[in-house]
Amino acid sequence: MKARLLVLLCALAATDADTICIGYHANNSTDTVDTVLEKNVTVTHSVNLLEDSHNGKLCRLKGIAPLQLGKCNIAGWLLGNPECDPLLPARSWSYIVETPNSENGICYPGAFIDYEELREQLSSVSSFERFEIFPKESSWPNHNTNIGVTAACSHAGKSSFYRNLLWLTKKGGSYPKLKNSYVNKKGKEVLVLWGIHHPSNSKDQQTLYQNENAYVSVVSSNYNRRFTPEIAERPEVRDQAGRMNYYWTLLEPGDTIMFEANGNLVAPWYAFALSRGFGSGIITSNASMHECNTKCQTPQGAINSSLPFQNIHPVTIGECPKYVRSAKLRMVTGLRNIPSIQSRGLFGAIAGFIEGGWTGMIDGWYGYHHQNEQGSGYAADQKSTQNAINGITNKVNSVIEKMNTQFTAVGKEFNNLEKRMENLNKKVDDGFLDIWTYNAELLVLLENERTLDFHDSNVKNLYEKVKSQLKNNAKEIGNGCFEFYHKCDNECMESVRNGTYDYPKYSEESKLNREKIDGVKLESMGVYQILAIYSTVASSLVLLVSLGAISFWMCSNGSLQCRICI
């Protein structure tokens, strides 16, 4: 009876003890992050670094509308294909949009020489001035400028020709040698385009130009070329057996371009004074134009995001996140989210930072939970929480700032004869893309690992801070909790939290209670030893009596014979 009483008193003493625990915040977040060592770690707070959504629209870029070429491509627009007349007034744009199946390019069959290079040059142009470089009425008085039309470039059912070129033919039965020049006084680069006609037979050559041995010479400071017509039979394209090759050059400010020919020249009529602008570009897209504004445009749609990475499209125009192949880039800012199991009781797993966090502590990341005669409650440690928030916020901002180099990324241009170069370029681009993706993912993994370790360290430091104050005035009971050997009211609890706990004040009371508890433990241990001995002896006696009874019964019925020899 005495032993039972002592054990009961011991249990009551443990139940009534004042307790303080160190723990961390938990919530109902389902955010998961990856670290170097773990995948899908549930955390209380995190930030997404990867943009994966767009609006599916073509938008104005910083308030400036794009130039939609519609059914025309770059060649048709610049040469002046009659079907592209609606594009003639275009003067400025934020970016240029081609459709994948644009059908109106060069209308008279032939080849546009160095077309891909021209597209590359144009991708950095944001506006131009279209002007008459060689006025039609005065530049070629000895040549016909009116009959050079073709059904291949028909418009409204009638034969026509490019709006920016003049097809010069003989006049009055002759094609005298022509010489004409232009001096660039625009103060900017001027794009000049011209063509060379290659008839299919000598009859057409004589009909159009009279001279059989014709030539065309085009010369500037940076360009010097002499062309000879190639007269040969060819299969018809767009009902034309002849061909026309198209050429271009950029004329620097102050430079002069000179044309000399005695036949087959498709002369410049209009030229373009170019104004380059950073952030322009050419994209190929089927998306439609809408009344919207953006800072970043992709062929799939506009991106309005300040995140450093995106996985939508590698081609971008404007201030855009860096394209990576990652499916997820999430950086942790909070803690591991392991809400404690409520049914285990307040000071079981719920109390500690080992088995779980506290959903009840909402005003900080780290803090305390106490229980005494005045009640119980949570209190966040504001100083350590604020220091952690500041540190992590600065780190996240630094990562975003370093990686958030927003820029335009347009595709490179290659013609059909440069497939090996194009394939090599794709491999190089893929290599750089893999490196960028790897660097981005590794950066996030490392920073997530460091952040979670940082939180663990902060909780441990808070625990050690309390432990160093309480010393032997309390005992560690696991899960981040301490059980006081003395009464600790709310004022006492607050002193532990703010680091002003008066150890000497409670030392004597703690010493007495500690000795009482130790005494109960010793006496309880003696009682248990006596009970153990008694239990052993009693069990042995019961066993002997049972064996004797069984032996007597077996002897009496003859099952067992007993002989005693003297």
Swiss-Prot record:
Disulfide bonds: C21-C481, C59-C292, C72-C84, C107-C153, C296-C320, C488-C492
Entry keywords, A to Z: Clathrin- and caveolin-independent endocytosis of virus by host, Clathrin-mediated endocytosis of virus by host, Disulfide bond, Fusion of virus membrane with host endosomal membrane, Fusion of virus membrane with host membrane, Glycoprotein, Hemagglutinin, Host cell membrane, Host membrane, Host-virus interaction, Lipoprotein, Membrane, Palmitate, Signal, Transmembrane, Transmembrane helix, Viral attachment to host cell, Viral envelope protein, Viral penetration into host cytoplasm, Virion, Virus endocytosis by host, Virus entry into host cell
Transmembrane regions: 530-550
Any Pfam family matching the protein: Hemagglutinin
Segments in the Cytoplasmic topological domain: 551-566
Keyword Membrane carried by entry: yes
Protein origin, superkingdom: Viruses
One GO CC annotation: virion membrane
UniProt entry tagged with the keyword Signal: yes
Mod. after translation: Palmitoylated. In natural infection, inactive HA is matured into HA1 and HA2 outside the cell by one or more trypsin-like, arginine-specific endoprotease secreted by the bronchial epithelial cells. One identified protease that may be involved in this process is secreted in lungs by club cells.
Subunit structure: Homotrimer of disulfide-linked HA1-HA2. Interacts with human CACNA1C.
Family: Belongs to the influenza viruses hemagglutinin family.
Name of the protein: Hemagglutinin
Native organism taxonomy: Viruses, Riboviria, Orthornavirae, Negarnaviricota, Polyploviricotina
